[in-house]
């Protein structure tokens, strides 16, 4: 098969799981092309693959840890143009794929349908209208149109691939609101992780080690500061901070001896394997990677970001970690870290998810799913 993968560039989770799929399809002898933009395209290239430049689409905006729906709508609308759609049409015509996989990139779906190429949506969020609730008249009207558009997409694609654990273990279950009419087109693949646990190297950290990752958005730096202050309160717990592309570690002064800043890394998996707990935002991709490596999570979701808040709530309710806040002070952060280390039930549950991720083998499951549907 000739596979074309379109990647949404807002959040590295989209890129990570598409790289996992690309690796799997290539290993099985299929032809793979990537379409990406921004730092997602850069990560694809740093991993060793070529990528075609595609127009950016959805733009997320916020400040001081709060998601700004109005600003996000404005920046997204400014990005959209007929010329961008025509560019995607030409790319599909040039590459002539047998199947298009579109991870959160909706222009790719519409263009594939225009070219009559089978297209599958990869996504973990299906209640986008929640972003627009109680945000004023403008946002409310926008939410109505957004819901209609997404409902069209979900009902018109050839299939929906959900890169999460199947129910009842799904982290995205509060974000999963799809009409029963499309149930037959939904496939829970399990986590799509670039590196399996057995294949990953392991960083030789002093233990216990807390891995703190801020993802890709610079306005999350407030969490770094609070976690850094928490680290100063107990030197017997070690911390490793992986910063996102927009964070300069040099901005943090007076770093204690039990803290290490690594800057941004394209390969976080040895860090996961060498750690005992992950502190992250509420993004689905990092949560899946952490759980697939058996790690409990302290999740700091972006405020007013419904999807992340739902993910964090599920983590707490299921006993995989705790939902935190940008207002959580360092003393309470430390108390939560100690609680997770002292209560073995957290690690027992997340180790079970690590074992389940190995059994499900998400990338291979997607490959087999598509090979079955598109034989010959």
Curated annotation (Swiss-Prot):
Keywords in alphabetical order: Glycosyltransferase, Transferase
Transferase: is it a keyword of this entry?
yes
Q: Which domain of life is it from?
A: Archaea
Show the Pfam families listed in the entry: Glyco_tran_28_C (PF04101), Glyco_transf_4 (PF13439)
SUPFAM superfamilies with a match to the protein in the record: UDP-Glycosyltransferase/glycogen phosphorylase
Q: Identify the InterPro entries for this entry.
A: Glyco_trans_28_C, Glyco_trans_4-like_N
As one GO molecular function, the record gives: hexosyltransferase activity
Task: Give the EC number(s) listed in the UniProt record.
Answer: 2.4.-.-
Tell me the enzyme class.
transferase
CDD domains referenced in this protein's UniProt entry, alphabetically:
GT28_MurG
Report the PANTHER family cross-referenced here: GLYCOSYLTRANSFERASE, UDP-N-ACETYLGLUCOSAMINE--N-ACETYLMURAMYL-(PENTAPEPTIDE) PYROPHOSPHORYL-UNDECAPRENOL N-ACETYLGLUCOSAMINE TRANSFERASE 1
User: What family does this belong to?
Assistant: Belongs to the glycosyltransferase 28 family.
The name this protein carries in UniProt is Uncharacterized glycosyltransferase MM_0582
């Amino acid at each position: 098969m000739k596979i074309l993968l379109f990647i949404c560039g807002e959040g590295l989770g989209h890129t990570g799981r598409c790289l996992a799929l690309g690796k799997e399809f290539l290993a099985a002898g299929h032809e793979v092309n990537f379409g990406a933009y921004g730092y997602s395209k850069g990560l694809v290239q740093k991993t060793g693959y070529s990528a075609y430049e595609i127009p950016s689409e959805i733009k997320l905006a916020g400040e001081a840890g709060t998601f700004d729906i109005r600003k996000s709508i404005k920046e997204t609308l400014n990005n959209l143009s007929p010329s961008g759609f025509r560019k995607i049409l030409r790319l599909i015509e040039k590459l002539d794929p047998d199947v298009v996989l579109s991870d959160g990139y909706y222009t790719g779906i519409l263009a594939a349908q225009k070219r009559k190429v089978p297209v599958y949506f990869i996504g973990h969020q299906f209640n986008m209208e929640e972003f627009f609730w109680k945000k004023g008249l403008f946002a409310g009207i926008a939410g109505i149109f957004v819901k209609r558009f997404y409902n069209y997409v979900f009902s018109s694609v050839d299939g929906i691939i959900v890169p999460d654990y199947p129910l009842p273990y799904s982290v995205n279950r509060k974000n999963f609101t799809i009409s029963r009419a499309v149930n037959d087109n939904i496939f829970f693949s399990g986590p799509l992780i670039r590196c399996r646990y057995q294949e990953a190297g392991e960083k030789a950290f002093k233990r216990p080690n807390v891995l703190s990752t801020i993802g890709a958005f610079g306005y999350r730096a407030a969490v770094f500061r609070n976690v850094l202050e928490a680290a100063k309160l107990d030197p017997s717990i070690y911390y490793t901070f992986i910063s996102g592309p927009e964070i300069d570690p040099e901005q943090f002064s007076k770093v204690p001896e039990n803290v290490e800043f690594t800057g941004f890394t394209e390969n976080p998996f040895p860090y996961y394997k060498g750690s005992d707990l992950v502190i992250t935002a509420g993004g689905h991709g990092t949560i899946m990677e952490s759980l697939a490596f058996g790690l409990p999570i302290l999740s700091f979701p972006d405020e007013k970001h419904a999807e992340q808040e739902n993910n964090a709530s599920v983590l707490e309710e299921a006993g995989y970690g705790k939902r935190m806040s940008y207002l959580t002070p360092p003393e309470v952060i430390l108390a939560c870290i100690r609680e997770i280390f002292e209560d073995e039930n957290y690690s027992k549950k997340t180790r079970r998810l690590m074992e389940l991720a190995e059994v499900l083998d998400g990338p291979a499951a997607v490959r087999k799913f598509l090979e079955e549907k598109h034989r010959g």
